[in-house]
Amino acid sequence: MSKRNTPPLRSSGINTIQINAAREMHAQTVRARRMPMPTSGITTPSVQPTAAPATPPRHICNNPNNPQCLHCGSVIIPSPRATLPLEDNPSISINDWTISSRKKPILNSQELDIWENEKLKGLTLPEMIFGNNYIRIENSKQHWSIEFNALDALKEVQLQDSGIRVAYSNDWINSKKRQNSTNGAQRFTNDVNDDSLNIIHKYDWTYTTRYKGTESSPESKFRLDNDQKLPLDKLAVHDKILFYDDMILFEDELADNGISILNVKIRVMNERLLLLSRFFLRVDDVLVRVYDTRIYVEFDENVVIRESKEFEGKYQDVLAKHRLSQSHDPKAALRDSNWVAQNTPMIKRQCEIIQF
């Protein structure tokens, strides 16, 4: 009887030692994530701490797509639910006041045609228009509201020549004069000037607008009072922000010669709100301009203050105030509207008030 040669058993799979090591490593990780437990062997009956009843917030979140946070009460922006086309309509109410906003994409080609041919005749439109965006502040008891939107802002752009020229315009005119002189057309030399540019549509190509908001009432309820000032002491208090939004209404890069942009932002606290509408213009090597409009509302007192400031200065004068020699981009500060507003002379201030 022959003896069968049986091959030696081969170990397959993961070694038992490796498995145990992996289990121990996992257990250590789990233990590290657990909160430390008391080591005393004496057990005491657990007593549930009695928490004081929380004061119910007086603000109401009106949009179910933008619920308030269960921990801090703030309105959740943007909405957690995605929709097509993209749209966001957060809203909040405090006392008789309701603050709402809407965000949508830039105007499509069909909407642009309607704006250019019907709503804004004679104005060549900016490159980007968020025409369906707005921020609205409304008092339901007084049937009054003020809204910031792109259409009404662009309606205040002048349909005439602003007189502002890009930095190289004089060089272009001088080159034309030299060219005419070289070609023997001396009699036409003096005819090459701004009038010979053949501007078909005369409008302010910088899109400068002194837009201060659109009121619902036919006549403004604001009363001029330049002695009024924004209560900076109240605004300096670190109150919880219940509602915040920030949006662009329109923007244009001026054919790579600068920037023209209108931006609106708002923050709402429990007792007050502050809105800032800022038009920022920078024409490279020519000028900078900032037009600020701030709306302040005190909810309990039903007071509305509107303050407008205009800043303007020559490009090189403002640039000279930027002394960061270690910066690789010395003109970076001129792309910051906050820095420009702080370092540009104020040429006008106006303050108005409403007391309901």
Swiss-Prot record:
Pfam families reported in the protein's UniProt record: TIP41 (PF04176)
Gene Ontology biological-process entries: negative regulation of TORC1 signaling; TOR signaling
Keyword check for Nucleus: yes
Chief location bin: cytoplasm
GO cellular component terms given for this protein: cytoplasm; cytosol; nucleus
Biased amino acid composition, Polar residues: 40-49
Matches recorded under InterPro entries: Phosphatase_reg/MetRdx, TIP41-like
TM stretches of this protein: none
Localisation per UniProt entry: Cytoplasm; Nucleus
Function: Involved in negative regulation of the TOR signaling pathway in response to type of available nitrogen source. Indirectly activates the PP2A phosphatase SIT4 via interaction with its suppressor TAP42. This interaction is enhanced under nitrogen limitation conditions. Also has a role in regulation of NPR1 in response to nitrogen limitation.
The protein, known as: Type 2A phosphatase activator TIP41
Taxonomic placement: Eukaryota, Fungi, Dikarya, Ascomycota, Saccharomycotina
